Swiss-Prot record:
It catalyses: a 5'-end triphospho-ribonucleoside in mRNA + H2O = a 5'-end diphospho-ribonucleoside in mRNA + phosphate + H(+); a 5'-end diphospho-ribonucleoside in mRNA + GTP + H(+) = a 5'-end (5'-triphosphoguanosine)-ribonucleoside in mRNA + diphosphate; a 5'-end (5'-triphosphoguanosine)-ribonucleoside in mRNA + S-adenosyl-L-methionine = a 5'-end (N(7)-methyl 5'-triphosphoguanosine)-ribonucleoside in mRNA + S-adenosyl-L-homocysteine. This is mRNA-capping enzyme. The N-terminus contains the mRNA 5'-triphosphatase domain, the central part contains the mRNA guanylyltransferase, and C-terminus contains the methyltransferase domain. One of its GO terms (molecular function) is mRNA 5'-triphosphate monophosphatase activity. PANTHER family: MRNA CAP GUANINE-N7 METHYLTRANSFERASE (PTHR12189:SF2), MRNA GUANINE-7- METHYLTRANSFERASE (PTHR12189). Probably catalyzes the second reaction in the mRNA cap formation pathway. Forms a covalent complex with GTP. The lineage of its organism: Viruses, Varidnaviria, Bamfordvirae, Nucleocytoviricota, Pokkesviricetes. The keyword Methyltransferase applies.
Amino acid sequence: MASLDNLVARYQRCFNDQSLKNSTIELEIRFQQINFLLFKTVYEALVAQEIPSTISHSIRCIKKVHHENHCREKILPSENFYFKKQPLMFFKFSEPASLGCKVSLAIEQPIRKFILDSSVLVRLKNRTTFRVSELWKIELTIVKQLMGSEVSAKLTAFKTLLFDTPEQQTTKNMMSLINPDDEYLYEIEIEYTGKPESLTAADVIKIKNTVLTLISPNHLMLTAYHQAIEFIASHILSSEILLARIKSGKWGLKRLLPQVKSMTKADYMKFYPPVGYYITDKADGIRGIAVIQDTQIYVVADQLYSLGTTGIEPLKPTILDGEFMPEKKEFYGFDVIMYEGNLLTQQGFETRIETLSKGIKVLQAFNIKAEMKPFISLTSADPNVLLKNFESIFKKKTRPYSIDGIILVEPGNSYLNTNTFKWKPTWDNTLDFLVRKCPESLNVPEYAPKKGFSLHLLFVGISGELFKKLALNWCPGYTKLFPVTQRNQNYFPVQFQPSDFPLAFLYYHPDTSSFSDIDGKVLEMRCLKREINHVSWEIVKIREDRQQDLKTGGYFGNDFKTAELTWLNYMDPFSFEELAKGPSGMYFAGAKTGIYRAQTALISFIKQEIIQKISHQSWVIDLGIGKGQDLGRYLDAGVRHLVGIDKDQTALAELVYRKFSHATTRQHKHATNIYVLHQDLAEPAKEISEKVHQIYGFPKEGASSIVSNLFIHYLMKNTQQVENLAVLCHKLLQPGGMVWFTTMLGERVLELLHENRIELNEVWEARENEVVKFAIKRLFKEDILQETGQEIGVLLPFSNGDFYNEYLVNTAFLIKIFKHHGFSLVQKQSFKDWIPEFQNFSKSLYKILTEADKTWTSLFGFICLRKN
């Protein structure tokens, strides 16, 4: 506290400084992280205490002269007063719970009248002053700032809005007269008005805490809570930069700890069978860190829970990670950070778990209700053995808590780098939303009223950076629900808009519900049913424990990324049985080997060149998008809206994961809004088109382009499928829109089979070093290319040695059908024509391109068609 003591001492010396005898000396405490909700909370709390107050209106014009602010202020209806303001010293409280509180010492000195110019900053201030004592006054000010051309354009209008309200302003009606949508700043300041020689640093801290307690009655507890998080962080983090984020409050406990990842089928396939992993149950509790620090025993979770003391003698610190049951004050440990002063974070989980039981015994020695979670080490890949292991964890009836899932922990990594996955039954997957009642009279078709229901909108939190990278926009009515000051922060609410259900944020609340007033509350909810553009939501409970977090302006339910990744479990359900036998429906799950490096790079180069032809287009549809192998190419091309369609739910779930991966790890010049549609493209074009046109924001005239990379062979079974594809493209494209197909060329494949005299059920192979690299199995008798229906088996780089059946694409017939449905051929080209360009692109990769690679690549081609 030396710095604050020094500031107070200098304040007192100023009154003995003869050079300042004509100056006004101010000591003010300012809160810098104030939004409308916090401002309103403090304002209404002071009004409720019936503290004497006055309301004043003023206009201050500020002109920067060197390092000083030259001001002209008019406190209505008085005359203008000219002065300069010079800061002398400041002290900033470091604890996050202080909301950026700063103590400022400054002087004001009268100056001559000066001329205003275009650089002036104008501040209109509606101030309520509460005289809390003879020593202190608390000033709450609503401010509108104007600069440059705004001054002449908006000054009169905002004077009316701030000062000349239809109803006379009083402290009791002020908050109802001011519209938070009018882009105001909100300031809370405390000014000392007592005798200078009587002031102490303790007085400053006391009045600061008084205001913070109005915002949060548990302010002192919050301060202790953040100090406990700092203590834990000091043993986990070595980076001073990251520790600074903890100290500043930018990071909390959730950001500090390694997070459990909701496991999708695609995740599991990467390490199935999970031999070596540890499994335990997922208790229906909250994440908590149990700490023994000196003589104190506590748990840091959603708040600070004191569990007792060790007595007079301080102990070396022990820090355990686990799940906490607040009602029963029971702790269930699943990891250890420190044991009796020994740091364990750099050891693998298989080593840490050996010490965990010792840490639990330390807690038990002080009569703390603590247990170690039951773990099983998976040692067999046999599905039957795996099933028994998972059943022994998930279906155990003797646990003292409810089990709502299974945790899988990867061995061999440090504490922060340990990969931990969570599997939960679909029914137990829930999301936390900030719920707001939809404003009336918006005239938005999607917001159509329903009798017996009131429409509410569901929001989650998102960082400004992720909001931009995902190319999101605020939903209609957003600005009526959230003030501009909240929208301008680094973290703010956004409607829950997952890629496959852009309107999932609409919730029709039954008038008969036992949950009556839900506006402005955080609700835990689950999805009951998913229909076209409509989700049936069920309220599980009101998160009363989160209401205080809302007041800080930094919490709005789940984080957007967490919410959508949890949502994937509704999109692509992962059954309990699949934990043992492996995920079903994992098409092309294998990884490519190194022998395909050059050929894969060539195909990627060609697709990149093609997708660049549609750069910066507004709406693009990808038919058969799979798991988003081309997503990065669309992002590089600056496509604004991408609709990916596929019948493989697991692949689409992986695409959504990639969406976030690109947003957080890769730099793209432009942002792309991504939508996914789970749809079999062999179904009637009319039905598919209707679903696409119902995507929120999709243009009535259609998309600019349709792309389908290496997919249309699935739709060449018969003429009806080809006709259906052409009709679908016509319905989805705007006039002049383009279709871009890459495909294996049926005529070229047949030519290859003839050249090598491959008969029915025989296989053409391309070998390198006695290894089969490429292969085609002939599954048809005809000697000439049919319009449709001729099957081949293809050995693919990622098919783990298995043949996948597909139909030959008769490109002449395909083009004929598309012409019949209103398209013109723009270009048809073989992939082999790109090989010289690929050589210029990467000489090193071209050098390792083999003859087999070139032969295989020559079987593929590109077709471009334009809608007339």
